[in-house]
């Protein structure tokens, strides 16, 4: 922790990233002088600026602070970035986001949530249950909590709830007292190379659990027998072989009511207002953590009923008798499958139109068959051009690759502008927009096209 106390001034390269902005808010809350760079202004960077954090949007060495104690960068920043190169050449303390999380969590009780999907919702649910029940925690989230409109909060209690990101193996720097693993599906193969390497990293993550600690895993993970800790629970939506699972599910006006069952206890009539059957499973993971920590059942139930979700996770951008518009971060075949089946569990009579923006050329290429299979679950699909993020184009890897593998007939690749024209003309009753790129910037214009008819 001594490293942290020495920092009076800190600079973030890529401050607008979801994980980076949480760290920026953490240091700001400690009275540290925080500033940063990002390549574009977003609602999130504007929130940071409003809190007193100086941000510039040009890659210029003359704009960076020369008296900073530490420089934090994200893996999404290219190695040749002028500001990063400058700080390295001048021998400043230059660290990754994961190094800073390691410093923060060295002396705390840590609840670390990992998994190739589901982790943001589970992390946010756990942090919300702990905050709402009065247990208290410091939270570093990979999404914006709809309850608190932030991805970070602090507490006097020396407990940290943190999203453990497997990208570039950064989660292996954390030492959990409680670890949750939500999924181990192949992802980030640009880093790991093979699905087996992804699994190996998660097994290593489970081995980081402190002696006497607890490991909570989704039922049915591959190589589950290699995931071991002193206290261990599996969870599932409906697999009764799991240590904790749901039963007696009822859908009421887009909300879910269910019981949660363990061999030692049963929690009756849990009400969750967040859509998507996969979110019942995410909720069970969070409840399992809360029960392990000894939080009272009634406090857990009240907190779950008050959970408003995570921005861009099954988020209703518009919901009235004429139109439903759902915005979601899904960018992996399994997430898309869960999203579409979740929407259909609530709106089973309506035609589901999906607008999907693929994220990364490498992921599109590696998971093309899986994407096509999941996209085929929708009634009609519009695919936008691939969002490149940190990557250069790959030959033969375009949105048409997915289109050609799909079996349904109502499908097309459109530009963003063409998609807006299509929405204005067709006025779909049930529209889902999914992706991790910049598709979220289209949600408001699409909402207005639906509202103004």
Model-inferred region functions:
Residues 2-9, 19, 23-26, 30, ...:
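Nucleotide phosphate-binding/pyrophosphate-handling subdomain across enzymes
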Residues 3, 26-32, 49, 62-66, ...:
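Phosphate-binding loop of NTP-binding sites
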Residues 36, 139, 179, 217, ...:
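Structural beta-sheet core signal
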Residues 10-15, 434:
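Conserved N-terminal Rossmann-fold NAD(P)-binding element of oxidoreductases
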Residues 66-70, 158, 427-429:
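Short acidic/histidine-rich motifs immediately flanking catalytic phosphotransfer sites
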Residues 37-38, 56-59, 95-99, 140-141, ...:
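Beta-strand->loop->alpha-helix junctions that form or flank phosphate-binding loops
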Residues 33-47:
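NAD(P)-binding Rossmann-fold cofactor-contacting core
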Residues 372-429:
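C-terminal helical cap/extension that packs against the catalytic core
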